[in-house]
A protein has these predicted regions:
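Cofactor-/ligand-binding subdomain signature composed of acidic, glycine-rich
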Residues: 1-38, 59
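Cofactor-binding active-site loop characterized by glycine-rich and histidine/acidic residues
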Residues: 26, 30-165, 183-189, 194, ...
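Glycine-rich ThDP/TPP pyrophosphate-binding loop and its adjacent helix/strand module
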Residues: 111-299, 303-306
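Acidic, proline/serine/threonine- and glycine-rich low-complexity intrinsically disordered segments
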Residues: 312-314
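Conserved small/polar residues in nucleotide/adenosyl-binding loops
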Residues: 316-322
Length: 326
């Protein structure tokens, strides 16, 4: 991994962006075991994709993430207390306690929330890209999907329309080998998603999804091309899901050997080791960055835990008045 192509400031920024969702998730897993959150869909081991993609985009370009893309939310610098409040069902959260997962978005940070079907976001991204193209705004739109999401019919519809209308949209496929517990080889026979994209007339690349520098540089190049000359791209990010579909489901259906192989490719450890090896950071600086992020997370958690719980009366503004005549 040659990091010398990127400025030191960029490398340090990517490092902090990588660490934040990892340390955030580790805290969430502790809270889950303590019963302070109800569920969690882990993206541990896949952070480089969310981080590299988000860092390469302009802040006013829309992103359609999924349930493992915490790095998109932290990468857009959403205050951590608001994210914790969302996942703990507090009033400060984006859904004000009415939902405790990733089913939320925010126009302020140009993020469109997902729904569990993991297909419709692709077509909606086409719509945003079409609006940008018609208004000549020179912006790109990014939509995430995965092995399972690509088996949805909307994957076909979205890619076909994007190709025919030459929309400035980039489809990110997190190819982690599984959809829930179904191996990819039981869903499709293509050797890679590049083959699928080419069938629609879409240019595509397959990259190491655990290499944040490669993800970042690839997205810089493709997003710049899409802004200058509207066209769609597909980026297959090869990675692996290091935990269960969600924490309650377990991982017994995945061979242990795969975990051992991919643990050696951990995106944080490999990037961190390269930064140290090439003299970009020292051990002391590394520890200082870790401590700073952990403190920020701890402060946010303590603030949100001290908030009052949602009470039923707070929901009434979403319903009809009880004394209304029908």
């Amino acid at each position: 991994m040659n990091l010398l192509q990127l400025p030191k400031e960029t490398l340090l920024d990517l490092y902090e962006r990588l660490l934040t969702p990892r340390l955030f998730e580790e805290k969430m897993l502790v809270l889950l075991r303590q019963g302070k959150i109800s569920k969690w869909f882990s993206g541990i081991g896949q952070e480089a994709i969310s981080v590299g993609v988000t860092a390469a985009l302009q802040n006013d370009e829309y992103i359609f993430p999924m349930h493992r893309n915490l790095g998109v939310f932290t990468g857009r610098k959403i205050p951590l207390n608001r994210l914790f409040a969302q996942f703990q069902g507090k009033a400060l959260g984006f859904t004000k306690g009415r939902e405790r997962s990733f089913h939320f978005g925010t126009n302020e940070y140009h993020i469109v929330g997902m729904i569990s079907h993991l297909g419709p976001q692709l077509s909606l991204a086409d719509g945003v890209a079409l609006a940008n193209k018609l208004q000549k705004e020179r912006k790109v739109t990014v939509a995430f999907t995965g092995d399972g999401g690509s088996s949805e019919g909307e994957f076909h519809e979205a890619l076909n329309v994007a190709a025919v209308w030459q929309l400035p949209v980039i489809f990110i496929v997190e190819s982690n080998g599984y959809a829930l517990s179904t191996p990819s080889k039981e869903q499709f026979l293509n050797a890679s998603f590049v083959e699928k994209a080419n069938a629609y007339g879409i240019e595509a690349v397959s990259i190491d999804g655990n290499n944040v520098a490669e993800v970042y540089q690839t997205m810089l190049q493709l997003s710049d091309r899409a802004r200058k000359n509207p066209q769609p791209f597909l980026v297959e990010c090869r990675t692996f899901r290091m935990r269960g579909h969600e924490e309650a489901s377990g991982t017994k259906y995945i061979p242990q050997q795969l975990f051992e192989e991919w643990a050696k490719k951990d995106p944080i450890l490999t990037f961190e080791n390269e930064l140290l090896k090439q003299g970009i950071i020292s051990e002391t600086e590394k520890e200082a960055i870790h401590d700073s992020i952990k403190k920020e997370i701890s402060d946010a958690v303590n603030e949100v835990l001290a908030e009052e719980e949602i009470i039923p009366v707070s929901y009434t503004h979403l319903t009809l008045p009880t004394n209304r005549e029908v």
